[in-house]
Regions:
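Alpha-helix initiation/capping motif
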Residues: 26-28, 41-44, 87-90, 111, ...
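Pocket-lining segment of extracytoplasmic ligand-binding domains
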Residues: 1-83
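Residue-level detector of short coil/turn "hinge" positions at structural boundaries
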Residues: 24, 129-130
């Protein structure tokens, strides 16, 4: 009859519902949206240039490289305790899909494309009334 019940969730929850036979993934938004700075870190330039800021950025960059280059099954095995209700094969599938979408690129700077896509989403949802310029918001680490 053209009606259904839909929810929006991030992985691995929808993949587990599908694996359990109680749901179906109708669409994945990530490939349609493309690069997006939705999950970003915020800090003041003074802190970023401090010893703590540089140490954090170095560790964060290593973590991103690890997520981008390590086999999904190895990551899933290490992260499994954080997802007690999720089957490890499902977690592996989800991590692999995120890797394929480029969710953890080695470059940690927010691209202008990703920033503008985020603003498009926020504007569509009427969460912002003004688009701040990329250069006014995004700080380039040197």
């Amino acid at each position: 009859d053209g009606q259904g019940q839909y929810i929006h969730q991030q992985g691995p929850a929808p993949q587990q519902l599908e694996a359990d036979g109680v749901g179906h993934i109708a669409a994945a938004l990530g490939p349609m949206v493309g690069a997006c700075a939705f999950s970003s870190l915020a800090a003041m330039p003074d802190w970023l240039n401090s010893d703590d800021g540089r140490a954090f950025c170095s560790a964060y960059a290593r973590a991103r490289r690890y997520m981008a280059s390590t086999p999904a099954a190895d990551i899933a095995s290490a992260q499994k305790p954080l997802f007690p209700g999720i089957n490890e094969a499902v977690l592996t599938q989800c991590i692999h899909a995120y890797q394929e979408m480029g969710c953890w690129p080695p470059e940690m700077a927010i691209s202008a494309e990703g920033y503008n896509t985020m603003l498009d989403i926020f504007a569509f949802d009427q969460k912002i009334t003004k688009r701040h310029a990329y250069d006014a918001i995004c700080y380039r680490l040197v």
